[in-house]
Every structure is written in C-alpha cells, then in structure tokens.
Amino acid sequence: MKKVLFIGNSHTYFNDMPQMVKELANAAGEELHVTMLTKGGMDFAWHQKQEQTAFNLRYGGYDFCVLQQAAHPFPGQEALSEGTKGICELAGEHPPRFALYMTWAEKAHPENQGEMTEAYRRTAREQALLLAPVGEVWQAFRKEHPDIELYFTDGAHASPAGSLLAAAVIFKTL
C-alpha cells in the first residue's frame, strides 16, 4: 500500500479529488491511502507554519506528497519556488517523493496559464520534483472537448469532471 499526503487548498479538496485519485488507483489494482491537509485560499507560506504539516511530513510515513500552491491569483515563480522548498525542508531525513500539482488558469483569464505552467515546470526542474501538469492537460482538454465543463460555476474551481481530470493526471504522475 502506498500513502499519499495532499497539501493545498480548495483546488485540492473540491469534489474530494484525493478520494478520486484513490479510486483510480483501486481500479488499477493498486492500494492507496490518501490524507489531506487543506484550507481554502491558503498558500505554501501558511502551510509551512502549521504544526500538522511538519508532523505529517516527518512522521506520517508517506510515499508521496502532492503540493498545490494558491492559484487565483497565482503568486508567481518566486513564491512557488520558495514555498515549495520550505515545505520540502520540513520533511526531515526521510522525505516522501514530492509532486507539484500544477493548477489551471481561471476561466475568464486563460492567458494566465502560460505563466503558471512555466513557473511550475521551472520549480519542478530546479528542485528535482515530480510534476502533475494538470493545468496544461486542462487547457488542452478544453480545446478538444468544449462540450465538457471542467469549471465549477465560479469559473475558478473544478466541476466534478474537472476534479476527475486532475485526479487522473495526478494518479498518472505518481
């Protein structure tokens, strides 16, 4: 059995997306245990200050940790890079394998995806992390399947279909 810790905000917990990752793993014959440390609107700087973040990373015995930074507004490359490094450092001597969960641009601002994509790719490359390119896949899927609504009614969060897409990309990455 593999254990996965998800650290993020509403883009992680909407529609219980980590549970979808678990169900995809089960369907593929793999046993997965998932745990979430999430709070709406919070970024990596907030998570670094929470005792449960360090405790889970050091003592939870996780195989993977999926990291999702604040997305709307996206705080930029520097905040992503520094926040990612800070959380990874909390893990101590036996860290899980970290994966960055690249989010998607708001429906009203698809032009923002390029900046997000570059920042996530650069951070993953520089810190030798896995990358779940959900935002890129999201953008391509919308072009190929405009009839399937990936966004929740607020134009920022995921619909159930959007969460399933995110879960599939994350499962494939892990």
Where are these regions (language model features)?
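Conserved SGNH/GDSL esterase-like catalytic core that processes O-acyl groups on lipids
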Residues: 2-7, 11-84, 107
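Alpha-helical cap/lid subdomain in secreted, periplasmic
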Residues: 54-160, 164, 168-173
